[in-house]
């Protein structure tokens, strides 16, 4: 699937069918958080995807991603983009040992 997004003032509509994979779902959930009019169906029911859904719905200042590495990396970028938010991402003991310095 190739999608190119660029800034526009024109409203557009369309439909993208996804496989429901964890990888596609996680990426599209973050796009939906930025573009709230994006409607998603057939989202993965994986633990990692549920972790991202819960984090994006949370109003807490500390978000626990447990052992979801993709969630940690994607949410790091997302919360860095949201300058009005101060969120601390944490996770399992093993997650906190994994490298992320290059992203921050």
What are these regions (language model features)?
Residues 1-104:
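Structural preference for solvent-exposed beta-strand-turn elements
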């Amino acid at each position: 699937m190739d999608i190119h997004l660029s800034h526009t003032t024109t409203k557009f509509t369309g439909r993208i069918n996804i496989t429901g994979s964890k990888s596609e779902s996680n990426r599209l959930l973050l796009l939906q958080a930025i573009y709230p009019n994006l409607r998603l169906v057939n989202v993965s029911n994986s633990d990692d995807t549920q972790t991202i859904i819960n984090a994006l719905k949370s109003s807490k200042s500390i978000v626990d991603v447990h052992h979801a590495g993709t969630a940690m990396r994607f949410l790091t970028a997302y919360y860095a983009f949201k300058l009005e938010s101060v969120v601390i991402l944490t996770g399992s003991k093993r997650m906190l040992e994994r490298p992320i310095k290059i992203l921050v």
